[in-house]
Amino acid sequence: MIASGVPIIAWRLWHVRRHEDAYRLESFTWHHVSWPARTRFEAECSTHGAAAPVRGHECGIYAFRTRELAEDLLRRYTGVRQHYGRTRQELPPLRQGCPIAIGRVSLWGRVLARENGFRAQYAYPYELFLIGGQDDLAGQLRRLYAVDVSPS
């Protein structure tokens, strides 16, 4: 476990989905789990009573050490494409109205290091880059989460 008073900055992905009155960040692999605005996101585990994350268990908020590792996860959802006889993995074509955010995230509390990243107790977006989103959506997320958001 990493014990530090300074947050760890890592990378992760989010879906950007409309929830009633506004677009919100939603976990990339756990659908329908929205990240709260202007307050920390806290890991929960219904399997054990201890605070997440716990060694030997898969609970916690996941994040990658590098942007490249986060992009690799995104590519795994798209498959491989052939281009001029060479195999390439491309970022996915986005469905209309379903943008994705890749960005840096602050992690703190109980943090467990893994080979390619971390699992944390608490997290909050630090900086976001939208894939498939327009300037107006970037502005909405910027105001809602109070972080820098850039359309890609």
Segments predicted by a language model, with ranges:
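Extended catalytic/binding region for NAD+/ADP-ribose chemistry, centered on the ART fold
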Residues: 51-76
